[in-house]
């Protein structure tokens, strides 16, 4: 985070285009266009700036699909952003990014999350400090090994041009980040996660972020197309709602992006669009031994080398 030469306008243009491309692809797949909610912060609010939320609820394929773009600025980095960088505490900041969470209707079709972002910390009389972050991760209710391999291979292909050491590094980071400590289980089968990234300078770091963003549809759409029409019943929907409870727990307790948004006075509707439309909890529930539900825990909710 030492190179202070950057181009926010190019990053903004890319992110807005990425949101549109993904929203158009999801709307075409579902048969229902995503609604558009453009928003702007008021002059008396803690944050300045605005954004655009693309949202689909009650669709044929997606029970909820939300893709948010935001570009906001504030007077002081929130604790979730400066905890690992105490030297930046109290600096002004600009944060822009695209974040999405898709909750399919069919329990055999996995939930997915993707985010790409840039942050700039500023202080009068000192050079700005920028960094990139992002990644994508897959959260199946019923695990399929070919889906996991495809998702991870696509992530690896997106990173390999920037160094073959990055995929294993970002995969491990993802496995460690998306972990529910109080449950002692991973949120899903992982993917890639990175933060505080500016080592190669602006151009190369921006290229990497674009490669991750551009890989998302290739990583996820083939899985949806394979699984969205599989038959299912009440048992599968009940287990889906139970597993979605874990998603809620992670997002509200651990997720850095959710905490950043809430701590900085972000737009609550956009921050919480990642929540599943239906979730439930059961006291001390255990899957039936040998069942497909049990196999999720034994074979998929543990870190594995998928490629």
UniProtKB/Swiss-Prot annotation:
PANTHER family: COPROPORPHYRINOGEN III OXIDASE, MITOCHONDRIAL, OXYGEN-DEPENDENT COPROPORPHYRINOGEN-III OXIDASE, MITOCHONDRIAL. Its EC number is 1.3.3.3. The gene is hemF. It is found in: Cytoplasm. Involved in the heme biosynthesis. Catalyzes the aerobic oxidative decarboxylation of propionate groups of rings A and B of coproporphyrinogen-III to yield the vinyl groups in protoporphyrinogen-IX. GO terms for biological process: protoporphyrinogen IX biosynthetic process. Homodimer. InterPro entries: Coprogen_oxidase_aer, Coprogen_oxidase_aer_sf, Coprogen_oxidase_CS. Belongs to the aerobic coproporphyrinogen-III oxidase family. One of its GO terms (cellular component) is cytoplasm. One of its GO terms (molecular function) is protein homodimerization activity. Pathway: Porphyrin-containing compound metabolism; protoporphyrin-IX biosynthesis; protoporphyrinogen-IX from coproporphyrinogen-III (O2 route): step 1/1. Substrate binds at residues 99, 115-117, 265-267. It catalyses: coproporphyrinogen III + O2 + 2 H(+) = protoporphyrinogen IX + 2 CO2 + 2 H2O. It comes from Burkholderia cenocepacia (strain ATCC BAA-245 / DSM 16553 / LMG 16656 / NCTC 13227 / J2315 / CF5610) (Burkholderia cepacia (strain J2315)). The record marks 182 as: Important for dimerization. The active site is at residue 113. Its cofactor is a divalent metal cation. Keywords: Cytoplasm, Heme biosynthesis, Metal-binding, Oxidoreductase, Porphyrin biosynthesis. It comes from the Bacteria. Pfam families: Coprogen_oxidas. This is Oxygen-dependent coproporphyrinogen-III oxidase. A divalent metal cation binds at residues 103, 113, 152, 182. Residues 247-282 are annotated as: Important for dimerization.
């Amino acid at each position: 985070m030492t190179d202070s030469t950057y181009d926010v306008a190019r990053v903004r243009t890319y992110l807005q285009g990425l949101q549109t491309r993904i929203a158009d692809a999801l709307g075409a797949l579902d048969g229902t266009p995503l609604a558009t909610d453009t928003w702007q912060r008021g002059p008396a609010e803690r944050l300045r700036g605005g954004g655009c939320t693309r949202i689909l609820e009650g669709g044929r394929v997606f029970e909820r699909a939300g893709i948010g773009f935001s570009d906001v600025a504030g007077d002081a980095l929130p604790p979730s952003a400066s905890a690992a960088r105490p030297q930046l505490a109290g600096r002004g900041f600009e944060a822009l990014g695209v974040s999405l969470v898709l909750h399919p209707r069919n329990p055999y079709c996995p939930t997915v999350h993707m985010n790409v972002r840039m942050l700039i910390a500023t202080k009068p009389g000192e050079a700005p400090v920028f960094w990139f972050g992002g990644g994508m991760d897959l959260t199946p209710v019923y695990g399929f090994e070919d889906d996991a391999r495809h998702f991870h291979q696509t992530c690896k292909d997106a990173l390999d041009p920037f160094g073959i050491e990055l995929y294993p590094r970002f995969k491990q980071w993802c496995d460690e980040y998306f972990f529910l400590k109080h449950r002692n289980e991973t949120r899903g089968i992982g993917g890639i996660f990175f933060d505080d990234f500016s080592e190669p300078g602006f151009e190369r770091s921006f290229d990497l972020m674009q490669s991750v963003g551009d890989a998302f549809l290739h990583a996820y759409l083939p899985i949806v197309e394979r699984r969205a029409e599989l038959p299912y019943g009440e048992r599968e929907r009940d287990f889906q709602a139970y597993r979605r409870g874990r998603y809620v727990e992670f997002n509200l307790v651990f997720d850095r992006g959710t905490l950043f948004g809430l701590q900085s006075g972000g737009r609550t509707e956009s921050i919480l669009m990642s929540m599943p439309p239906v979730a439930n909890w059961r006291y001390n529930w255990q899957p039936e031994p040998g069942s497909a539900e049990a196999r999720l825990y034994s074979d998929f909710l543990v870190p594995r080398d998928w490629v």
